[in-house]
A protein has these predicted regions:
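Short, polar loop motifs at secondary-structure junctions
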Residues: 11-15
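P-loop NTPase nucleotide-binding module
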Residues: 1-9, 159-165
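P-loop NTPase motor domains
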Residues: 16-25, 29, 33-183
Length: 183
């Protein structure tokens, strides 16, 4: 109903028709990994776009640390300092340059750069996570197809970012979050 919002995480496309029928957006997260370059319909995420805000920068530092730990990196105080320094420098760049590739250029640790490589535009997950401009629906009904994402090493990073974005949209209006066939 008017003023409410729905976020649905789907597996197998069972919510697609309902979401589109309600005037919502349906995003195929796994399909974005295999989309052709320049496909304007594919989901494209820019997790570092808002790091000029100190709270967003702190969130990004934690998100990156978790993502890199998933790649086998030991995130010690030195690694955290490298991440924070690069994020702080990147925060002053124009929004279109606040990408994971932009972060990699500024990182002073070769090990962190190597661990970040799969998430850069030239890596297997870059088409989804290293956009210069975010393409993610803004409708009050959002459905995210996760089937093609399940099993991918990027799944945790993608879902953590999406839940962070959803958290930013929680404004007191009635909200439903659906996790269909969750794991």
């Amino acid at each position: 109903y008017k003023g409410s919002q729905i976020f649905a995480f789907d597996f197998g496309g069972s919510i697609r028709a309902a979401a589109l029928g309600m005037g919502g957006d349906w995003q195929d997260l796994g399909g974005a990994l295999h989309a052709e370059e320049g496909d304007s319909a594919a989901v494209a995420l820019q997790p570092l776009a808002r790091i000029d805000n100190a709270g967003e920068r702190a969130w990004a530092a934690e998100w990156l640390a978790a993502m890199l730990a998933g790649e086998g990196m030991v995130i010690d105080p030195a690694a955290k300092e490298h991440l924070w320094s690069a994020l702080t420098s990147l925060a002053s760049a124009p929004p279109a340059e606040r990408t994971l590739t932009g972060l990699a250029v500024l990182l002073q640790s070769q090990e962190l750069k190597q661990a970040l490589a799969p998430y850069l535009i030239c890596g297997p997950w870059g088409r989804l996570l290293d956009a210069e401009q975010e393409r993610l629906g803004e409708a009050s009904v959002q459905a995210f197809e996760t089937e093609g994402l399940i099993g991918a090493s990027s799944a945790a990073a993608v879902l953590a970012y999406l839940f962070h974005r959803i958290e930013g949209r929680l404004d007191g209006s009635p909200t439903m979050i659906i996790i269909d066939e969750g794991w």
